[in-house]
From Swiss-Prot:
HAMAP family on file: PurT
EC numbers for this chain: 6.3.1.21
Keyword Magnesium: yes
Residue positions binding ATP: R116, K157, S162, S163, G164, K165, G166, Q167, E197, S198, Q199, I200, E205
The protein's name in its UniProt record: Formate-dependent phosphoribosylglycinamide formyltransferase
Enzyme class: ligase
Alphabetized GO MF terms: ATP binding; magnesium ion binding; phosphoribosylglycinamide formyltransferase 2 activity; phosphoribosylglycinamide formyltransferase activity
UniProt keyword Ligase, yes or no: yes
One GO cellular component term noted in the UniProt record for this chain: cytosol
Protein keywords: ATP-binding, Ligase, Magnesium, Metal-binding, Nucleotide-binding, Purine biosynthesis
Species of provenance: Acinetobacter baylyi (strain ATCC 33305 / BD413 / ADP1)
Protein's gene: purT
Pathway info: Purine metabolism; IMP biosynthesis via de novo pathway; N(2)-formyl-N(1)-(5-phospho-D-ribosyl)glycinamide from N(1)-(5-phospho-D-ribosyl)glycinamide (formate route): step 1/1
């Protein structure tokens, strides 16, 4: 089966609509551009990172069914690639059912993973995968009961949030009401529902990037895996990641089994970020994102094809290569201030080591804990790579430029 791509901005163009235009989407756009795809990028605010490298950009409320449907009808894309959760998924289901475009990886996957309830019930209740104990709550009263039922300490997350927003660790009943209030302000959609999870005694967390792509000879969808990525979080937000993460053969086999089972259930082609807890040979499912994962930014330095190139190739029906060529790490660069018109200095010091690199995302506005860039580094060991990446990130100074 031949894969054909036309010419951007002409009638033969193969068009992709990206819903959500953050830093991960920016790298996806660049990968698609290199393969001759015409890219349309949408987000809720102007000048988002991926918009800056797309052929066309649009600002709208993607959670509004009317606005989203109007945009899709005007573009008539071949593929729709969601990058965030806050999308009117009922429109994507309608688009897929009417065969107006292909939703990546599938409308079902996007709908299930848009909130933690859908994917947790699929993983634990339908697929029988090992997870933490959990309860859902949609009121303060039911939340108090859920916390008591699960026990302390527990973890609380809005069912619709990302990058640690609204998440907290509740150590006792005295902290329950404050955790509820924090969860209500941190979710992407203020629907109130939260998940309360038991604390798992684990050694480390990994992201297992799992790629579903077509075999170039048979056309059958096959599953491939990148080497496991270790990561460190602060308040639920990724701070640094490294590849590979050492683990036992038994744990890696079980991690792949879990990732295979959940991604097959979600269907479609593309990359999935499967988050797992590891203790010895034991593995628990945590979450899955049907798109590139923030911890996977390390693959820009470690693999022949980064997670973004893998995603672009897989959704276009092209062969993929998940091989890692280097030990590498990534470290986040935060804004550290609430301001716009930012500048970044000491970049020459940050890049002084030949095995370091930077990605500055180009976000138009900074907040103290907003990711504005990432440093990557290669080395002989993960500890050395982590140290190099962290040093590079710390060299970067964020300056509030004059608005004159």
């Amino acid at each position: 089966m031949s894969v054909t791509i036309g010419t951007p901005l002409q009638s033969s163009a193969f068009k992709v609509l990206l819903l959500g235009s953050g830093e991960l989407g920016k790298e996806v756009v660049i990968s698609l551009q290199r393969l001759g795809v015409e890219v349309h990028a949408a987000d809720r605010y102007d000048h988002a990172p991926a918009m800056q490298v797309a052929h066309y950009s649009y600002t709208l409320n993607m959670a509004d069914p009317v606005e989203l449907k109007k945009l899709i009808e005007s573009i008539q894309p071949d593929l729709i690639v969601p990058e965030i959760e806050a999308i009117a998924t009922e429109v994507l289901i309608e688009v897929e059912n009417n065969k107006l475009a292909t939703v990546i990886p599938s409308a079902k996957a996007v709908n299930l993973t848009m909130n933690r309830e859908g994917i947790r019930r699929l993983a634990a209740e339908e697929l029988g995968l090992p997870t933490s104990a959990y309860r859902f709550a949609d009121s303060l009263e039911s939340f108090r009961a859920a916390c008591d039922d699960i026990g302390y300490p527990n973890f609380v997350k809005p069912v619709m949030s990302s990058s640690g927003k609204g998440q907290s660790r509740v150590k006792s009943f005295e902290e329950v009401d404050a955790a509820w209030d924090y969860a209500q302000t941190g979710g992407r959609v203020k629907q109130g529902k939260v998940i309360v999870e038991s604390q798992i005694d684990f050694d480390f967390e990994i992201t297992l990037l799992t790629v579903r792509a077509k075999n170039p000879e048979t056309g059958a969808i096959e599953t491939q895996y990148c080497d496991p990525i270790g990561h460190r979080q602060d308040a639920g937000d990724y701070v640094e990641s490294w590849q590979p993460q050492a683990m036992t053969d038994a744990a890696l086999t079980e991690a792949k089994r879990i990732a295979h089972k959940v991604t097959v259930a979600l269907g479609g082609c593309g990359i999935f970020g499967v988050e797992l807890f590891i203790k010895g040979d034991h593995v628990w499912f945590s979450e899955v994102s049907p798109r590139p994962h923030d911890t996977g930014l390390v693959t820009l330095a470690s693999q022949f094809q980064s997670e973004f190139e893998l995603h672009a190739r897989a959704i276009l029906g092209l062969p993929v290569n998940t091989t890692r060529h280097s030990v590498a790490a990534s470290a986040v660069i935060y804004a550290g201030v609430d301001a716009d018109n930012l500048s970044f200095s000491q970049l020459n010091q940050a890049l002084a080591h030949p095995e370091t690199d930077l990605r500055l995302f180009g976000k138009p506005e900074g907040f103290k804990r907003r990711r504005m860039g990432v440093a990557t580094a290669r080395a002989e060991t993960t500890d050395q790579a982590r140290e190099l990446a962290t040093q590079a990130a710390e060299h970067v100074q964020v300056i509030v430029a004059s608005n004159q």
